[in-house]
UniProtKB/Swiss-Prot annotation:
Function comment: Could be a silencing control element for the regulation of the restriction system.
Source superkingdom: Bacteria
GO biological process, one term: DNA restriction-modification system
UniProt-recorded name of the protein: Uncharacterized 10.2 kDa protein in HgiCIIM 5'region
Keyword vocabulary terms for this entry: Restriction system
Amino acid sequence: MMIESVAISVKESMPPQVSVEINGMLNDGCTAFHEAKQSIDGNTIKIEVTTIRPKDAMCNQQISPFSTIIQIEGELKPGEYTILVNDVAEALKL
């Protein structure tokens, strides 16, 4: 799986609601988006995106796109953050 782009959206609310749109490519026709686990370490928000694939499946080798939107959990205080999706980083300023 390859992450191609990460787009951050902030809703003007109190506290701010942050969502992250993740776009990428899956390796073959059998691979699917599995989950996105998130954690916050200081001012770094880590999102680990994983895939799932049936064991021993015969799959076409066609790369296919995927897209998902993740809502950042927890209350973020004003400041500068780095959102790290697998190995793709984006800056966020609240």
